[in-house]
Amino acid sequence: MSYDHKAIEKRWQTYWDEHKTFKTAPETSGKPKYYVMNMFPYPSGQGLHVGHPESYTATDIMARFNRMRGFNVLQPMGWDAFGLPAEQYAIKTGHNPADFTNENIKHFKKQVKSLGFSYDWDREINTTDPEYYKWTQWIFEQLYKKGLAYEDEIMVNWAPDFPGGGIVVANEEVIDGKTERGSYPVYRVPMKQWVLRITKYAERLLSDLDDLDWPEAIKEQQRNWIGKSTGAAVFFKVDGKSDYQVEVYTTRPDTLFGASYMVLAPEHDLVDKITTSECRADVDAYKAKIASKSDLERTDLNREKTGAFTGAYGINPVNGEKIPIWIADYVLSSYGTGAIMAVPAHDTRDYEFAKKFDLPIRQVIKGGDISKEAFTGDGTHINSAFLDVLDKKQAIEKIIDWLEEHDAGHKQVNYKLRDWIFSRQRYWGEPIPVIHWEDGKQTLVPESELPLRLPHLNQDQMKPSGTGESPLANAKSWLEVTRQDGVKGRRETNTMPQWAGSSWYFLRYIDPHNDKVLADPEKLKYWMNVDLYVGGAEHAVLHLLYARFWHKFLYDLGIVPTKEPFQKLVNQGMILGTNHEKMSKSKGNVVNPDEIVDSYGADALRVYEMFMGPLTQSKPWSTESLAGIRRYLDRVWRIFTSDGDGINPIIVSENDHKLDKIFNQTVKKVTEDYAAMRFNTAISQMMVFINETFKAEKLPKKYMNAFLQLLNPVAPHITEELWQRMGHQETIAYATWPTYDESQIIEKQIEMAVQINGKVRAKINTPVDISRDELAKMATDNPDVKKQVADKNIVKIIAIPGKIINIVVK
């Protein structure tokens, strides 16, 4: 007998909606809080894929589990709805991005609701809602006031031949030096951008990782991205140009005696000033040649090294040697000082460059064979004057002392982390609330006038402005403003990146309808920080780092009560195709969750995705295994029901105690496994329990009710239905979580082998608390043992309960 999943799921989803079953209780409820959330989705036109329910079910299990354990649970959902795909679609089709984004959200929400997640929908947020991005703009204004938001000339990807007069494209839209759409040539050019000074928080972002319950791999990725290192700044004067010096940062100042040339990034501001007339043409040609290369291409270790000589020389401060200054694309202006001292004997990239351009290679650390390759290991110093015979640590300390004493450099802590380029030349994003005035002044839009709303643009206005500005430059009536004193101004045309709205959304869920403040301080104090945050590992760095940065900034302002937003982070594994490949349309292996829900039911999909394997591991999809889960749920249905609407008559009030042990084992294991997010093994244990119920003559009602509670977090619809049929008037959602009796789990009997003269001749079941004499009597009374010793004399019996029985005979 199969249950009607369509009718049951529709009935309970309607019930939960109408009764607002999962509306979060007030902060004054007196209950301890549990704040659990997923990384909110971008509502694409494609809708949900089977990867979404995996992480959503995981958080829903934790939400439902903790509600029954007496926690006040906040589990919200929202939409990260700004983004490039919507704008590209709008330009292509002529539809307004706001309109079809809202349509996408409706479709997404319908799909999410069909899976029975226990969200508090009264807290739903949408990053494109002006009442939401009012506060995104407000945070930007606070950053601006504190000097953490500023404008700077930044290298961008500029496609001047793009239809409409040119466009700035993101790194991910550049393929082999051309635009993804239309294959127009892309050039790296400087353009004014808004930048956030995340580097001011580098040390705190690094050190506070230690206090977080996050996967170590994610923390390590953030540490590497922040990239703290200790080394030295070294100053090289330019020969013949006493006004100029090149500053380099190096973690190995001890190799200074091995520096045989220098390399500047082609964009370095000294390049034009120091290049000689003889080398000017080569340098200009080289700069033009690499203008379209992305940072990723430029730093590819497998690429052949290229460069151009400037004709200038730097003076090595430690020995006065003149060394040639080159430019090369493998040095980036955005990292360090945009200049390096090259020690080819001990650096692989420098070695390859030196070999290609026939530059000197001078060994200063003992070891290896530098005629074949760079030696990058540790060793004692050679050819290094006063550093000779010192090891790495000693030499670094000594050379830094020397540099500081001679004003030629100093010890320095450096970070790989760069300031966050915050502006995009796009329409579909939060407007940056800044006005540029004709008199050169720059002001923020007054807080009382926020939100600064996006103007409606038609299809023609949505096209590139042709100036490198966003399409907002085409919205003249919105763009141009006049001050009270008659001075004219222009609004900022750049918009914020998609990361902006997701950098603080977890705070707005706490108080989503407050129009006076970002969120009520008392509510923030009660709910923060997030107890469990679940999402993909692909957001390991950018989203999580930006959210931590904004949160720390708001903490410094006294807005939020915690230093960190997310206490525990879990990354779900990927659901792969049946062939273990990533699901994609091109491979034809995409599974549509709507079809699964229609054919097998939402509960079957939820249970299956949790049963596939550990949450954090990648797993291949199997429709056969899904069908097996559906059969299991049908078995659950059959053990509880009889024909019609009745309950199975063997479910009775009295307890014959035959299920005591398996029931208590199941409650214990499921409770512990849910708490540790081991959902697959919890489900396995519940399968064992149901198998045992089919062998029983009577099923205690107390145990069967409790089983429904155990299964409910994974399969909420079928359990709500059966809970009601068991005679309950209220929803199962807030029923008190079952407890177990440890004494019922402990083994009351154990099997022991009986040896005769050291050989096993029989096996007996004995009580665990049996005495030695009783154990000896049980052994000798055993019929098999009696036969073996019938014609023999028993010399002695060694009987140790729980360990050994050995009868010695002659």
From Swiss-Prot:
Keyword entries, A-Z: Aminoacyl-tRNA synthetase, ATP-binding, Cytoplasm, Ligase, Nucleotide-binding, Protein biosynthesis
UniProt-annotated location(s): Cytoplasm
Single GO BP term: leucyl-tRNA aminoacylation
Catalytic activity: tRNA(Leu) + L-leucine + ATP = L-leucyl-tRNA(Leu) + AMP + diphosphate
SUPFAM superfamilies reported for this sequence: Anticodon-binding domain of a subclass of class I aminoacyl-tRNA synthetases, Nucleotidylyl transferase, ValRS/IleRS/LeuRS editing domain
Coiled-coil portions: none
Gene3D superfamilies listed in its UniProt record: 3.10.20.590, HUPs, Isoleucyl-tRNA Synthetase, Domain 1
Binding positions (ATP): K585
Motif mapping: 'KMSKS' region: 582-586
GO molecular function: aminoacyl-tRNA deacylase activity; ATP binding; leucine-tRNA ligase activity
Domain of life of the organism encoding this protein: Bacteria
Main location class: cytoplasm
Pfam families noted in UniProt: Anticodon_1, tRNA-synt_1, tRNA-synt_1_2, tRNA-synt_1g
Name of the protein: Leucine--tRNA ligase
Organism of this sequence: Oenococcus oeni (strain ATCC BAA-331 / PSU-1)
